[in-house]
A protein has these predicted regions:
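An active-site-proximal structural segment forming one wall of the substrate-binding cleft
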Residues: 56, 114-135, 163-194
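Aromatic- and acidic-residue-enriched carbohydrate-binding clefts of CAZyme catalytic domains
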Residues: 23, 66-122, 138-172, 200
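Active-site beta-loop-alpha junctions enriched in small/polar residues
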Residues: 35-37, 64-66, 133-137, 198-200
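N-terminal small/glycine-rich loop or linker at the start of catalytic domains
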Residues: 16-35
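Acidic, proline-/serine-/threonine-rich low-complexity intrinsically disordered repeat tracts
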Residues: 2-19
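Catalytic domains of carbohydrate-active enzymes, especially glycoside hydrolases
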Residues: 43-66
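Active-site mouth loops of central-metabolism enzymes
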Residues: 29-43, 164-172
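Conserved beta-strand positions
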Residues: 32, 61, 195-197
Length: 200
């Protein structure tokens, strides 16, 4: 018969957790999948306007969900001892997104469009919660990795290759994913009240 010791969190940690939970409980969030389908800045602003009208507090914007539809001005990445030029990464991501779904309305939002959108949302009192999915829902990123010369980035399950999931045993693919997400996280840092970072 084993006795389990009960360990209580320090009062400060418990109080902080309660404050965070209370704040999150007051959130009313609308989620838009702007990764699978392209949404123009005007469409997103209209969604923000409607969200405000209906009492929402935040817009959860999936820019990386199968497709990757947000491009920074500088997309250069250093992964280990390899540097990928910005234009090469942009072209590979754009091609990867088009391979997932070549949306006739557009491919991606630019950095200036996103910065403007964040400012617009803030002025309306709407927070922006950006998301780039990993290790799954990465179709465009996996295709981009292959175009950039990373071999076999896709997870393989008994001979069946996943179109969406990175192989967590492929160190180069994992490092590339982390570098890409770090790049986006650095851009969004301080621009969003809830900074979440998907890590592999």
């Amino acid at each position: 018969n084993k006795e389990v010791a009960k360990v209580e969190a320090p009062p400060v940690a418990t109080e902080r957790a309660a404050q965070v939970n209370e704040k999150l409980a007051k959130k009313k969030i609308v989620s838009i999948d702007a990764g699978r389908k392209y949404f123009s800045p005007d469409q997103l602003k209209e969604i923000i306007d409607k969200a405000k009208h209906y009492g929402y507090t935040d817009l959860h914007l999936l820019v990386g969900n199968d497709g990757l539809r947000f491009m920074l001005d500088d997309m250069s990445l250093t992964v280990g001892d390899k540097t990928y030029a910005s234009d090469d990464v942009k072209r590979a991501v754009e091609n990867g997104t088009n391979a997932y779904y070549n949306d006739p309305n557009g491919n991606h939002l630019s950095e200036s469009e996103m910065t403007d959108l964040i400012g617009y949302a803030k002025n309306k009192g709407i927070g922006l919660i950006p998301t780039v999915n990993s290790p799954g829902h990465m179709d465009a990123i996996l295709n981009a990795m292959k175009e950039l010369g990373i071999e076999k980035p896709n997870f393989n399950y008994f001979g069946k290759e996943s179109e969406r999931t990175v192989d967590l045993d492929n160190e180069k693919a994992v490092a590339f994913t982390k570098a890409l997400i770090d790049k986006y996280a650095a851009y969004f840092a301080g621009k969003s009240e809830i900074d979440r970072k998907s890590v592999v």
